[in-house]
């Protein structure tokens, strides 16, 4: 596969033409009476027309046929995609999943859409408030099929296998340790080259933003220029048997047929686009004197709520870095949080739990459910000689953190058969070290 080209910058106002049709963008206006190359002009709005300029999202697409050229939508099998957060009763326990099993291609072909499984979520799609966490497990490419989401944005985190994503804006390659965001309403199709697995964070009614940096300053964390946007690419391809367009609308799946590929956008301009990001480019901030900084310093992207400083969802990573804090228990501290914390592992191991939490699996610590390092981690870190050391080399754990109380689906609790019933046992060996007659702690030797 030839190396793909991209435009650099987060949320930028961009313009792109397929080089096969130079001059395909209209000059000085959006909607001429006749577009260059006799294309159709179509606007894709990601915000209300009257949103303030700094939050106004839209792009103009110049395409061979407009998106409206299709047969009626009809309801299709929902598979394991759901927005019913009352399928099973609530469970406040610490939950951990073993690696989710990928279907074997020799047994059944499963593409990206057929392999979507909703794990947990909260909120209401119709009121544009909430989120869902999905797992994708697939082994084949989408053939003459595309998908778009009327409900929200997809933040896609591949864990195993490379993806080639066709969008109306162009093509993106995606591999583990990269993420991409396909925003609401954007049509895309996914090619895979092996058995493939990953995670999806879906947010309703809002878009992902870079977090405010505050006293960090003008630079740091995920820098805007490291986000990549695809360049225009089109195919003028008729599909005699009909091309299938799948839509998720109000949590349900629908499909329609059309005669042509939807990836017929010759040129586009605007600031409402898909984009990708390599997690290795994250500039890590950390404590360099003492104590363990809060994990918010590792936020890559945030989807803000209406309450200042409170997110519907944050995407947080735990990347390789130096640990140098003196007189400090360096692993993550024991915690009870008003937020919900879903964690996944792309590769390696997580610093607070060396065993049991595996790549391709996950964990959920719900609001106010206690969690923290396992017994083995506590004992080792409490006695370790504190020298500068590398932390998390060769690993990448991440967290979807939310102010919403997440409900787990029936698939997540029962059907997937990946729930680790013995998770709680990793804390059972914790013992009291209390010395009521001696205030001085035992110093590591």
UniProtKB/Swiss-Prot annotation:
Keywords (A to Z) from UniProt: Acetylation, Dioxygenase, Iron, Metal-binding, Oxidoreductase, Phenylalanine catabolism, Tyrosine catabolism
Entry GO MF terms: homogentisate 1,2-dioxygenase activity; identical protein binding; metal ion binding
Pathway info: Amino-acid degradation; L-phenylalanine degradation; acetoacetate and fumarate from L-phenylalanine: step 4/6
Signal peptide residues on this chain, from the entry's feature table: none
Organism domain of life: Eukaryota
EC number of this enzyme: 1.13.11.5
Any one Gene Ontology BP term: amino acid metabolic process
Modified residues (N6-succinyllysine): 414
Modified residues (N6-acetyllysine): 98
Disease implicated: Defects in Hgd are the cause of alkaptonuria (aku). Aku is an autosomal recessive error of metabolism which is characterized by an increase in the level of homogentisic acid.
NCBIfam families the UniProt entry points to: hmgA
Family: Belongs to the homogentisate dioxygenase family.
Name of the molecule in the record: Homogentisate 1,2-dioxygenase
Organism: Mus musculus
Lineage: Eukaryota, Metazoa, Chordata, Craniata, Vertebrata
Encoding gene (name): Hgd
């Amino acid at each position: 596969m030839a190396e793909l080209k991209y435009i650099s910058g987060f949320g930028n106002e961009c313009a792109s033409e397929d080089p096969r049709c130079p001059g395909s963008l209209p000059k000085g206006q959006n909607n001429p009476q006749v577009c260059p190359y006799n294309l159709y002009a179509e606007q894709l709005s990601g915000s209300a027309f009257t949103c303030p300029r700094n939050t106004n999202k839209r792009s103009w697409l110049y395409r061979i046929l407009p998106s409206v050229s299709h047969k009626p939508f009809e309801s299709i099998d929902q598979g394991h995609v759901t927005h019913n957060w009352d399928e099973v009763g609530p469970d406040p326990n610490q939950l951990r999943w073993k690696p989710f099993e990928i279907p074997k291609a020799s047994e059944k072909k499963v593409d990206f859409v057929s392999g979507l499984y909703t794990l947990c979520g909260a909120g209401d799609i119709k009121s544009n408030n909430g989120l869902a966490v999905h797992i994708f497990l697939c082994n084949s490419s989408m053939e003459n099929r595309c998908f778009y989401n009327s409900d929200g944005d997809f933040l896609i985190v591949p864990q195993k296998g490379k993806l080639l994503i066709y969008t109306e804006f162009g093509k993106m390659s995606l591999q583990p340790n990269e993420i991409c965001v396909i925003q609401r309403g954007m049509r895309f199709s996914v090619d895979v080259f092996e058995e493939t697995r990953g995670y999806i964070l879906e947010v309703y009614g809002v878009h992902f933003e870079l977090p405010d940096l505050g006293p960090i300053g003008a630079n740091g964390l995920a820098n805007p220029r490291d986000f990549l946007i695809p360049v225009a690419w089109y195919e003028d391809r008729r599909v005699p048997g009909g091309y299938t367009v799948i839509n998720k609308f109000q949590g349900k799946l629908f499909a329609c047929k059309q005669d042509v590929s939807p990836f017929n956008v010759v040129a586009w301009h605007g600031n409402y686009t898909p984009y990708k990001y390599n997690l290795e480019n994250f500039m890590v901030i950390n404590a360099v004197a003492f104590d363990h900084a809060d994990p918010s310093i590792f936020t890559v992207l945030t989807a803000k709520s209406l309450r200042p400083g409170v997110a519907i969802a944050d995407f947080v990573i735990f990347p390789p870095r130096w640990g140098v804090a003196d007189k400090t228990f360096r692993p993550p501290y024991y915690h009870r949080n008003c937020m919900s914390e879903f964690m996944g592992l792309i590769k390696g191991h997580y610093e607070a739990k060396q065993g049991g939490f595996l790549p391709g699996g996950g964990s959920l610590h719900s609001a106010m459910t206690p969690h923290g390092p396992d017994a083995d981690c506590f004992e080792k870190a409490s006695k370790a000689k504190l020298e500068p050391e590398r932390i998390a080399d060769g690993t990448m754990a991440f967290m979807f953190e939310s102010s919403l109380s997440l409900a787990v689906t029936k698939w997540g609790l029962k059907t997937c058969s990946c729930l680790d019933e013995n998770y709680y046992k990793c804390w059972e060996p914790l013992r009291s070290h209390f010395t009521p007659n001696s205030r001085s702690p035992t110093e590591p030797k």
